[in-house]
Amino acid sequence: MSLITGLFKDQNSAETAYKSATDMGYSSDEINVVMSEDTRKKYYGKDATLETEVGNKAAEGAAIGGALGGTMGAIAAAIAAVGTSLVLPGLGLVIAGPLAAAIAGAGAGGVTAGIVGALIGWGIPEDRLKDYEQGIHDGGILIGVKARSDDDARRFENDWKQNSADHVTA
């Protein structure tokens, strides 16, 4: 499985990329989304006000995310799903998807190291982390998916590049 990541400059391009993954049969549990808290507020404001704490695994979150999915963007629904997202106010980040579970496992004391370790463990080269960190700081949205096949990986890479993604890594 190849990890495909891309940094999207705006909500529309990120939503289109997220939708392309779900249209290919990937679930929100397989799609990672990382953005700043300011970006979440800017693009998803009142629709994504449900905040989670590190390690909070409330089961009802999945139902909330699914119920909200029809009334707002797919990314906002993923953020709202308590069981699959983290809001890290001290770092100003919002993380949704399997990466959130990996970071939650680090516990509150290891969150900062957990994020860096999880991103590296996720397969993002260390030299690319700086590009993503700056892009997220500047309001971008990072999306990543572990492609199930080489064909899926090529499709993600092509679709995301055509959809204004920066720093697409396969």
Where are these regions (language model features)?
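Small-residue-rich hydrophobic membrane-insertion segments
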Residues: 53-131
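Cytosol/matrix-facing juxtamembrane amphipathic
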Residues: 2-55, 106-170
